[in-house]
Curated annotation (Swiss-Prot):
InterPro entries, A to Z: Mitotic_Regulator (IPR052945), Sel1-like (IPR006597), TPR-like_helical_dom_sf (IPR011990)
Biased composition (Basic residues): 374-385
Gene, per the UniProt record: DSF2
Biased composition (Basic and acidic residues): 14-24
GO biological process: negative regulation of G2/M transition of mitotic cell cycle
SUPFAM superfamilies, sorted: HCP-like
Protein name (database record): Protein DSF2
Domain of life where this protein originates: Eukaryota
Source organism of the structure: Saccharomyces cerevisiae (strain ATCC 204508 / S288c) (Baker's yeast)
Low complexity bias locations: 238-256, 285-294, 303-318, 335-350
Length: 736
């Protein structure tokens, strides 16, 4: 009996316990979930490795158990379900990562940000942006400057042959069509090109081809490269508003010239003097009209300037007003003041460019001896020197009137005995860009004390630039080279010996084929000096004593700011028939440096520097097709001077209408191609640019343009976007 009671009590106790457990579970399930904010905050701060607390909430366990109980899945089904959930979660995570991240391309150059591109862009992204822009950005050639160079070398790349970088594009020809009338559309069948045989004049009122918008100065390339595309796209709209061709130092000149250039010439690549002095590169270029020669032997080592005319536009201009009436005479001596004003005269042009500071360190050390000489220098001596100079300037020389016949017009050169118009002694100290002045060493010869004093007064101190080649002259007579050399000429012609140091301007190996080394030895007085020298490659005529002295003194006076005296020396050298003097004096006439501006007479002197005998046979009738060249090696690496720069300047004169009634693109292109055949790199690039664009007088020829660009690229020109010139369809040979 007692045993049964115990069994029943035990069973009842178990049942009651089960009921209480179920009741507790139901109450817990019906009660609201506890707030686990404290636990969640604690989980983020502490680790539960040594704790008995669970990081999983009771609610999640309860919900999972209820779902599994309702599904009644087996163990295998549960595993399959968990794997499917994991795969779906991984797929969604990968899709999100692919849309938000991609490969990063790091550019090694400074000031170039990292470029991030999406490999698999979403359809919405493609619709939001232009598809062509994405494709162009993903191309590797858009990040290259030229050839196979990476974009990291954009800022560091400096061309060795040309002053400019040229924008070369295959299909861009909007500039030509933007300035034409609707009835002049060349796509129509009724359009007829002008007849070039009738006086070489177009009948459709042509606008001159604006080639300046397709080239940029290398000194400004790294500043303008980020905004190059945007400025080039907006340049067409700015052409209509720019009547006077005004530009700023931060924009590329894109203005077009519809009338011939007057005395106010354009400044296509205008920037400040500080930028010019800090960014000027000099090397062994043979490309320039801006090549100014410090001495006679410098012709094969010119400055890296493409054109004198372009150089005048590269400096910042100074607008003179009527209020500028306080003259300060520029002194060749070094002064403490860094500024000077310019006097406006009747013969002075409205726009005068200021010279930049020389971009090299010159030895201009003042010694106490020089200051003592200035202290004890009497006014009588100064007046005497000035009187000698004036009397020498009026000394009689050979008088003749030269007549040059070019393009059917007789260009009369003035008599060489006529003096230069005395316009004003206070002209701007501009003309040719400042070149390094080389130090000349005179061989020690027995002289009297009076001769030494004369030489010290007549010869100014010269600075020496170590990075350029040195020129040393030896003179047999100490009186040769003085200011009185015109009146003390000897009957025996004198040829100074020139010795050039084999130092390349580009830091490269010297070109032995174009250098002439003079080995000379001086013996005792009374013995004959033995010399051994090869013939100079680019100087067919020997330099006469008068010619070399005039050119050297003219350049020295120009550095001292004596523009009128410098122009007078150049004119006297022209009387001797010096081709270099023709080039320099013609450029002086073009820009009004020391003489009155005369564009037509300037063209005559530039023509004389080219040594062209028959204009029709040697220029107009000459068909130079670069596609027919047997080999690019036939074109010399160094252009002959001053012939090539003179041809280039004549081409620029015809393209811009300097010295004629209207621009003539056909004749200008003929001059450029002739200069390009001689190795002038800028002429090659401009010839290709002109042939790549359609104009009023010709159709564009991309094959011919690509041929010129390939030659220029091989010679060291910097071409932007030049991948297309090596396509197979542009490599075909032209008709012979």
């Amino acid at each position: 009996m007692n045993q049964n009671l115990k069994n029943t009590s035990w069973a009842d106790r178990i049942g009651s316990d089960d009921q209480e457990r179920k009741a507790n579970s139901s109450e817990v399930s019906q009660s609201p979930p506890p707030n686990n904010s404290f636990e969640s905050s604690m989980d983020s701060q502490f680790s539960y490795a040594h704790s008995n607390k669970s990081s999983i909430s009771f609610e999640s366990i309860q919900t999972t158990e209820r779902l599994l109980d309702k599904l009644d899945l087996s163990l295998e089904d549960e595993l399959i379900l968990q794997e499917a959930l994991l795969e779906e979660e991984n797929a969604s995570r990968n899709s999100q990562l692919s849309q938000t991240s991609g490969p990063t391309l790091c550019m090694p150059a400074s000031e170039f940000p990292s470029l991030r591109y999406r490999t698999n862009p979403s359809p919405t992204y493609i619709q939001a942006r232009d598809r062509s822009l994405i494709i162009d950005n993903l191309k590797e050639k858009d990040s290259t400057l030229r050839g196979k160079y990476s974009s990291g070398k954009v800022e560091r790349h400096l061309p060795v042959k040309s002053r400019y970088s040229y924008i070369v594009e295959e299909d861009y020809d909007s500039e030509t069509f933007s300035g034409m009338k609707p009835q002049m559309n060349r796509n129509e069948k009724d359009y007829k090109y002008p007849n070039l045989e009738n006086g070489n004049r177009s009948t459709n009122s042509p606008n001159p081809f604006n080639f300046e918008k397709y080239r940029i100065e290398n000194t400004r390339l790294h500043h303008l490269y980020p905004t190059l595309i945007s400025d080039n796209n907006t340049s067409v709209d700015n052409n209509a508003n720019s009547k006077n061709n005004r530009t700023t130092s931060n924009n590329i000149n894109t203005s077009t010239k519809t009338d011939r250039i007057s005395e106010k010439q354009s400044c296509p690549n205008e920037f400040t003097t500080t930028q010019k002095s800090n960014c000027l590169y000099r090397n062994g270029s043979s490309t320039s009209t801006n090549t100014s020669f410090s001495e006679v032997g410098q012709l094969s080592k010119p400055k890296t300037q493409s054109s004198f005319e372009s150089e005048s536009s590269s400096f910042s201009k100074l607008k003179l007003t009527k209020s500028d009436t306080t003259p300060i005479k520029p002194s060749p001596k070094r002064s403490n003041s860094s500024t000077s004003t310019i006097t406006k005269t009747n013969t002075m042009t409205n726009d005068i460019s200021l010279p930049p500071t020389p971009p090299y360190k010159a030895h201009k050390k003042k010694t106490s001896l020089n200051s003592l000489k200035k202290l004890f220098k009497s006014p009588r001596t100064r007046a005497k020197n000035k009187k000698d100079l004036e009397s020498e300037g009026s000394s009689p020389i050979r008088s003749a009137t030269n007549s040059l016949d070019f393009s059917g017009e007789n260009i009369q050169l003035p008599s060489t005995s006529s003096t230069i118009n005395n316009s004003s002694p206070h002209l701007a100290r501009y003309i040719f860009p400042p070149n390094p002045v080389f130090h000349f060493k005179t061989a020690s010869t027995p002289q009297s004390s009076t001769d030494k004093k004369k030489n010290s007064k007549a010869r100014p101190n010269r600075t020496h630039l170590r990075t350029f080649s040195d020129f040393h002259t030896t003179e047999k007579d100490s009186k040769i080279g003085e200011l009185s050399a015109l009146t003390e000429q000897s009957n025996k012609p004198y040829h100074p010996k020139v010795r050039r140091r084999t130092l390349s301007l580009d830091g490269m190996l010297p070109n032995n084929s174009t250098q002439c080394m003079d080995s000379f030895s001086h013996k005792k007085e009374g013995s004959n000096a033995t010399s051994k020298c090869g013939k100079l490659k680019f100087h067919p005529e020997p330099y006469d004593n008068d010619e070399s002295s005039h050119i050297g003194q003219a350049i020295t006076m120009r550095h001292q700011g004596k523009l009128e005296e410098s122009a007078q020396r150049l004119k006297k050298a022209c009387a001797c028939g010096n081709k270099t003097a023709f080039l320099l004096y013609g450029l002086a006439l073009r820009h009004g440096c020391g003489v009155d501006k005369n564009l037509k007479l300037s063209l005559g002197y530039l023509m004389a520097a080219t040594d062209i005998k028959s204009f029709a046979a040697e220029v107009l009738d000459l068909d130079i097709n670069p596609l027919n060249f047997a080999s690019m090696d036939d074109i010399p690496d160094i252009a002959p001077e001053p012939t090539a720069p003179a041809l280039y300047e004549c081409g620029m004169a015809y393209l811009k209408g300097l010295g004629m009634d209207h621009p003539d693109e056909r004749k200008g292109l003929k001059f450029l191609e002739k200069a390009a055949l001689l190795g002038h790199v800028d002429s090659m690039c401009l010839s290709g640019t002109i042939w790549s664009k359609t104009s009023n007088v010709k159709k564009r020829d991309l094959a011919r343009a690509a041929a010129w660009f390939r030659i220029a690229d091989k010679k060291g020109a910097n071409l932007l976007g030049s991948d297309w010139i090596y396509k197979e369809k542009y490599m075909k040979q032209g008709p012979k």
